[in-house]
Amino acid sequence: MKITRQKHAKKHLGFFRNNFGVREPYQILLDGTFCQAALRGRIQLREQLPRYLMAETQLCTTRCVLKELETLGKDLYGAKLIAQKCQVRNCPHFKNAVSGSECLLSMVEDGNPHHYFLATQDQNLSMKVKKKPGIPLMFIIQNTIVLDKPSPKTIAFVKAVESGQLVSVHEKQSIRQLKEEQGLVKDPEQRRRKKRKKVSGPNPLSCLKKKKKTQDTNSSASEKKRKRKRIRNRSTSKVLSEKQNAEG
């Protein structure tokens, strides 16, 4: 029975590795329901998960899951202790915590780029996860850890990729990486720097204004010179007329 379980797990892992780029160490996101089931079944997750998956694993959770377990009180105190020993992954709900199921679902959005496994006993969450391709799902049944087979949505997605109708998530990531290496995709940080440089640069309009100012000063200076000449002309003519009158 144990050998059959491991054979199935190996087959499913191969499927996710080849089609979605899942790799070791396998990152397994746990919710409160899975931790509670492990506690009741006396399952040592740190020992049994690597043995079952025949690979190195990382047990992970989120702040929202820990907050939810803390809120639920004494009944789930043991589950909370198990979750607290897991690595805490950053979720987008740092300020306002959401339910554990909502949080874990958000962690596998956009094609599950971090290749998380999702471990839960929540049927509602499991159904939502199965509607998204490429997410390995785990649960506990009869005190035994099980890696679920790929969902129909996942299989349909892989078939569509194979027939050329879609590009796989793994290929999308590879294409983006190649574009970044070739400099075809600009890093957002570089864009911000360029924008900042443009703002801090000299404004050509301000240069034009300065030129206009110098022209104005030149014209005003020439007007002053002209005025001075006129004044000098008047004074000499006056002197000449007075001289002529005196002689006459």
Curated annotation (Swiss-Prot):
GO cellular component: nucleolus; small-subunit processome
Gene Ontology terms: biological process: rRNA processing
Stretches with biased composition (Basic residues): 224-235
Keyword Signal set for record: no
GO MF, any single term: small ribosomal subunit rRNA binding
Positions bearing the Glycyl lysine isopeptide (Lys-Gly) (interchain with G-Cter in SUMO2) cross-link: 179
Main location, first listed in the record: nucleus
Domain of life: Eukaryota
Residue ranges of the region described as Disordered: 177-248
Annotated compartments: Nucleus, Nucleolus
Modified residues (Phosphoserine): 174
Keywords: Isopeptide bond, Nucleus, Phosphoprotein, Ribosome biogenesis, rRNA processing, Ubl conjugation
Keyword Transmembrane carried by entry: no
Start-end of Basic and acidic residues biased regions: 177-190
Family as reported in the entry's similarity comment: Belongs to the UTP23/FCF1 family. UTP23 subfamily.
Biological role stated in the UniProt entry: Involved in rRNA-processing and ribosome biogenesis.
Listed name of the protein: rRNA-processing protein UTP23 homolog
Gene source species: Bos taurus (Bovine)
Gene giving rise to this polypeptide: UTP23
